[in-house]
């Protein structure tokens, strides 16, 4: 059983959904970034979704773009990122770790090299934001070869054909978009998702985790009630880092409070 399967099985026993925060590795700097990831898991995050800083994050709104800029300014390279992931993996052997990246980063040193590094660092899944299913074969083949789940996005407007492909090609979990557009807590998640979940389930897709615009416990509760296996919160998590970047103690306290509240909302 891989880490995602083990997590979903454990949560099912407890009658809970998964809470998965997203942060950009190296934001605001590599040292504090490690503390942030450690704090998120300690405060109750079921899995981590991590970004490798990139100069042109197309799918992201201003909050996560800011995180990328801070991380790049503090000299966070992919090598630094993989080192930090390996450190978190060593401390938390069972916590699933997913990466959310852009294709250019994967191409930079060769696709196989990228997935080899993922495997060595203990990464469980990779979602490439700008690679749709019909262009994914090369990435997917390499991911599977290195025991990394390829994650695909199920958009709210998807046809049955798209959902079937996402279900067939994906592993680990399915990233369910609550609405179209770029990421951001400023724009509320556009529920309801029950209908989309029902369609995904008929194609036997990996468990669906809802993302985009999830910033408060009530939305997590709603997502779980609608049948999602969990909720991902990116911009709201990153906003806390942005607000407290100059005061590490306040930052870690605020992240602990936020994560605990979001996790509590996953109880069915």
UniProtKB/Swiss-Prot annotation:
> What pathway is this protein a component of?
Amino-acid biosynthesis; L-tryptophan biosynthesis; L-tryptophan from chorismate: step 5/5
UniProt keywords (A-Z) are:
Amino-acid biosynthesis, Aromatic amino acid biosynthesis, Lyase, Tryptophan biosynthesis
**Which Pfam families does the record associate with it?**
Trp_syntA
Keyword Lyase among record annotations: yes
User: Known CDD domains for this protein?
Assistant: Tryptophan_synthase_alpha (cd04724)
Q: Per its record, what are the GO molecular function terms?
A: tryptophan synthase activity
By its UniProt entry, which Gene3D superfamilies does this protein fall under?
Answer: Aldolase class I
Fetch the InterPro entries from UniProt.
Answer: Aldolase_TIM, RibuloseP-bd_barrel, Trp_synthase_alpha_AS, Trp_synthase_suA
Annotated coiled-coil positions are none
Say yes or no: keyword Amino-acid biosynthesis present.
yes
* Gene Ontology CC entries for this record: cytosol
Any idea what job this protein has? The alpha subunit is responsible for the aldol cleavage of indoleglycerol phosphate to indole and glyceraldehyde 3-phosphate.
**Subunit structure, interactors included:** Tetramer of two alpha and two beta chains.
Q: Which family does it belong to?
A: Belongs to the TrpA family.
**Protein known as:** Tryptophan synthase alpha chain
Per the record, the gene is trpA
């Amino acid at each position: 059983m891989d880490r995602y399967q083990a997590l979903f099985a454990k949560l099912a026993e407890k009658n809970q959904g998964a809470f998965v925060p997203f942060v950009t590795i190296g934001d605001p700097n590599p040292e504090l970034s490690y503390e942030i990831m450690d704090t998120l898991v300690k405060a109750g995050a079921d899995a981590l979704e991590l970004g490798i800083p990139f100069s042109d994050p197309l799918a992201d709104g201003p909050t996560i773009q800011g995180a990328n800029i801070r991380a790049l300014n503090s000299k966070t390279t992919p090598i630094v990122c993989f080192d930090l992931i390996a450190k978190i993996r060593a401390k938390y052997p069972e916590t699933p770790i997913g990466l959310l990246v852009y294709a250019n980063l994967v191409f930079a040193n060769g696709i196989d090299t990228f997935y080899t590094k993922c495997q060595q660092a203990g990464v469980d899944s990779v979602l490439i934001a700008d690679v749709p299913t019909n262009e994914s074969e090369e990435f997917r083949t390499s991911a599977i070869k290195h025991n990394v789940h390829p994650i695909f996005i199920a958009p709210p407007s998807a046809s049955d054909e798209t959902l079937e492909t996402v279900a067939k090609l994906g592993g680990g979990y399915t990233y369910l978009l609550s609405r179209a557009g770029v990421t951001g807590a400023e724009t509320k998640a556009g529920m309801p998702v029950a209908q989309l979940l029902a369609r995904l389930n008929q194609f036997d897709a990996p468990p669906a985790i809802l993302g985009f615009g999830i910033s408060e416990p009530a939305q997590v509760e709603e997502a779980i009630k609608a049948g999602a296996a969990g909720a991902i919160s990116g911009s709201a998590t990153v906003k806390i880092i942005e607000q407290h970047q100059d005061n590490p103690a306040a930052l870690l306290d605020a992240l602990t409070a936020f994560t605990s509240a979001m996790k509590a909302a996953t109880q069915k």
